[in-house]
């Protein structure tokens, strides 16, 4: 597993470091120029709000723009170009491989704490499979190398990098648990993670709308069965489902 993760980290990092003449050389694309100016504007103005933090780039007008990436990068010491390069390296070679590892571990059951002798054999096989997928992920150009280099759509890439974590939390939510405290913690973490994905870039709302329905349907069906014998249980679930749909519709309309 460590070998697969090492390949997933080393290959994209090596590609970026060998292509750039130096960390202070900005990517020669339009979006990179805008994002570098956004980092400088946040540092000078001291405002990283998504609702007006980049007003200096819009002739003083307060407009919506996802500034999570720029706000985080602006906290690092150094001029905008090298700290942005460091951010590109961190997301491409650290955040995404670890995010992918978490999703694969959850999907294959490697995060399970207890295992029988038979399960241990299967666990070793799954570990090898996950390590192979991690190593092969370094050869995928579509993400994160393309958005982080040739396109320089860094806020969007940050939003996509957070999606595996949300899916892991979705899967944990649909599992039965006896502790209401644990379930409440998972709900709060899921809301925070989903909110972070949307805050990083508005298209995160659309991505969540595409990825969430299978998990939500499974969760609602299981809750429907459990609440069937309770008075008012089904009505409460229907109300929650309607409210969720309304929130998605209103959010999609606002982000259009």
What are these regions (language model features)?
Residues 181-202:
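Membrane-interface alpha helices of multi-pass inner-membrane proteins
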Residues 113-116, 163-185:
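Membrane-interface transmembrane helices that cradle and orient dolichyl/undecaprenyl
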Residues 207-244:
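Perimembrane helix-loop-helix junctions
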Residues 13-161:
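Active-site lumenal/periplasmic loops and adjacent helix-entry segments of GT-C-fold
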Residues 31-38, 42, 240-256:
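Transmembrane-lumen/periplasm boundary regions of multi-pass, lipid-linked membrane glycan transferases
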Residues 1-20, 235-244:
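Start-transfer (signal-anchor) and selected internal transmembrane alpha helices
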Residues 10-12, 135-143, 194-198, 245-253:
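Aromatic-anchored segments of alpha-helical transmembrane domains
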Residues 96-107, 162-174, 192-193, 209-220:
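Transmembrane alpha-helical segments
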